[in-house]
Amino acid sequence: MKILVIYNPQAGGGRAKALLPDITAYIEAKGLDATIISTNYSGHAVEIAANAKLDDYDAIIASGGDGTLFEVLNGYYQNPIQASKQNKPPIGLIPNGTGNAFMRELNLSATDWKKAIDIIAQNNPRLLDVGRFTTENKTYHFLNIVGMGFVTDIAEASLPLKWMGNTSYTVATLLKMIFLKSQKMTIEIDGKCLERDGVFIEVANSRYTGTTFFIAPEAELDDGKLDIIILNKISRLKLLRVFTSIFDGTHINYPEIEYIKARTIKVIEEKPGKLIPDGEILGSTPVEIECLHKDIEFLWD
């Protein structure tokens, strides 16, 4: 099995660099023929995946956090071989970053790189849905989630706290709660228009965000639908209670939360705000998002 591994040595606060020799040795021990390319800058994984000769490989592997997987996915969709719908290799994951939400779908932790390589060696692809969103006249793809509103404030605040690991998202949430505000949002879901005074919207393909937040407990990766979580205007005190319930998914029981499954969603905010797709700050509202049903293969356990 011939694989291309796009490796982010800066993942996990730079800890991934020290892991590379061990990961390389284990890949070889599993009998995999690997080409390993390390990324050198933000956006490099996009370029590598976009320019790779995909038909030379049996799988394309992202090794890093959710941001690395996001870049590899988007480079994959930019690749002319992928666009031709011929000889499309599956994607795989070796997690070793700070934010590793998608690995939870594979029942992996950030230290489970050996188990991840075992999964890759099994060569058992599964068809998955992919989210596609258009913002600022550009189109991107995601496997995890796109957030807007208060969640982008949290993401920005968590960046200088990445040294704290998964705790960075929790600390950032508590810090930004001081500045909590809602705003008017126009939301079109499968053609039906809603007007809301919202705090945030999350559009999820998978169940987790920020590794530990069980944001979309009913999400399925192959149902042809995205799970939309809308938090309407809420007090700081009640938001604190909602926040603590996100870890086990019971936040969806609060009346301020709307949980909707749909194929398409469009969002316009009264004051255009930034987007946070798969942990990356990229684009802004207005945004159009849709589900591409079973559009890629992903190496699964």
Task: Please identify what each model-predicted range represents.
Residues 1-63, 74, 192:
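ATP/NTP phosphate-donor binding region
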Residues 30, 78-199:
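Catalytic core of DAGKc-family lipid kinases
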Residues 45, 67-72, 102, 128:
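Short glycine/serine/threonine-rich phosphate/pyrophosphate-binding segments
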Residues 147, 151, 202-216, 281:
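Glycine-rich phosphate/pyrophosphate-binding beta-alpha loops
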Residues 162-168, 212, 217-238:
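Gly/Ser/Thr-rich active-site loops/lids in small-molecule metabolic enzymes
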Residues 181-183, 197-199, 222-227, 261-263:
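A generic structural signal for short beta-strands and their flanking turns/coil linkers
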Residues 189, 195, 220, 230-301:
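ATP/nucleoside-binding phosphotransfer catalytic cores, i.e., glycine-rich phosphate-binding loops
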